[in-house]
Amino acid sequence: MVWFKRVKPSIRTTDKRDVPEGLWWKCEECGAMIHKKQLEDHVYTCSDCGYHFRISPYRYFSILFDNDTYQEFDDALRAGDPLGFTDTKKYSDRVHDTIGKSGKTEACRNAWGEVGGNPLVVSAMDFGFIGGSMGSVVGEKISRAVDKAVELNAPLLVISQSGGARMMEGAFSLMQMAKTSARLTLLSEKRLPFFSLMTDPTMGGITASFAMLGDVNLSEPKALIGFAGPRVIRDTIKRDLPEGFQRAEFLHEQGFVDCIVHRKELKSQIVRLAGMLKV
């Protein structure tokens, strides 16, 4: 028996499937709903609270390079499987599946172009590819970015966005820490500036190698920066951690980060620093 019967037809609302996917983004900090166009206008930051969304290397390239004009290089490098590593699946299958699902080919992209009318080489990491982890290809790309900067007599900017070394490559991954750090000495010898921008997150072997070696170490606001994560540290020392521990602002207070820069001001900051350090 039906107790209630709808006499009049309900008001028809727009079906959810009529709304294009990705049109609205939710801020992970304050929960605000942001239209895609507004998000683009604010370089993928929340206009309410300033939260910085993770973005791809290509979006950083668009923000930085004059007229969105740049030349990508060494984009054909692909990860191998030197150890035949398998956890829940084969490493080679994991790489293949990630490429197929994301359209990304590795956790780092290199490009060069003009920023403020002067040449700049940028190596940007991508958390969307296996957590932005550094394997042999990422280490090689960053090393080649150093070589390109020397070739062009230009500064180098490395944008870190990574969970650390890629465990599936074992020692091949760990040696990239030494390899990239050693390669950066070429810039010192040529008196070329190296800028390191740490974004959320910059962890593990990335922090323990090139990310902290910049002539100027910059960070986006509230980026998580450290070696082991705060939960691991807290469980190990059995003590509560200071408020904001391992966040950019905390590291800035301790002198590990030279400057916290909003993404809107990133290009102008790089232009200013490059001008100051130009020889």
Swiss-Prot record:
- The CoA carboxyltransferase N-terminal domain sits at 23-279
The zinc fingers classed as C4-type run over: 27-49
User: Is Membrane tagged as a keyword?
Assistant: no
GO terms, molecular function: acetyl-CoA carboxylase activity; ATP binding; carboxyl- or carbamoyltransferase activity; zinc ion binding
Compartments in which it is found: Cytoplasm
| Primary location | cytoplasm
**Superkingdom of this protein's organism:** Bacteria
Q: Which UniProt keywords apply?
A: ATP-binding, Cytoplasm, Fatty acid biosynthesis, Fatty acid metabolism, Lipid biosynthesis, Lipid metabolism, Metal-binding, Nucleotide-binding, Transferase, Zinc, Zinc-finger
EC top class named in words? transferase
What reaction gets catalysed by this protein? N(6)-carboxybiotinyl-L-lysyl-[protein] + acetyl-CoA = N(6)-biotinyl-L-lysyl-[protein] + malonyl-CoA
Q: How and how many cofactors are bound, per the record note?
A: Binds 1 zinc ion per subunit.
Q: What are its cofactors?
A: Zn(2+)
GO cellular component entries: acetyl-CoA carboxylase complex
Q: What is its EC number?
A: 2.1.3.15
Q: Name one GO biological process term.
A: malonyl-CoA biosynthetic process
Q: Which family does it belong to?
A: Belongs to the AccD/PCCB family.
HAMAP family given for it?
A: AcetylCoA_CT_beta
- Tell me, what does this protein do in biology? Component of the acetyl coenzyme A carboxylase (ACC) complex. Biotin carboxylase (BC) catalyzes the carboxylation of biotin on its carrier protein (BCCP) and then the CO(2) group is transferred by the transcarboxylase to acetyl-CoA to form malonyl-CoA.
Q: How does it assemble?
A: Acetyl-CoA carboxylase is a heterohexamer composed of biotin carboxyl carrier protein (AccB), biotin carboxylase (AccC) and two subunits each of ACCase subunit alpha (AccA) and ACCase subunit beta (AccD).
Protein name as catalogued: Acetyl-coenzyme A carboxylase carboxyl transferase subunit beta
The protein's organism comes out as: Chlorobium limicola (strain DSM 245 / NBRC 103803 / 6330)
Give the lineage: Bacteria, Pseudomonadati, Chlorobiota, Chlorobiia, Chlorobiales
| Gene this protein is translated from | accD
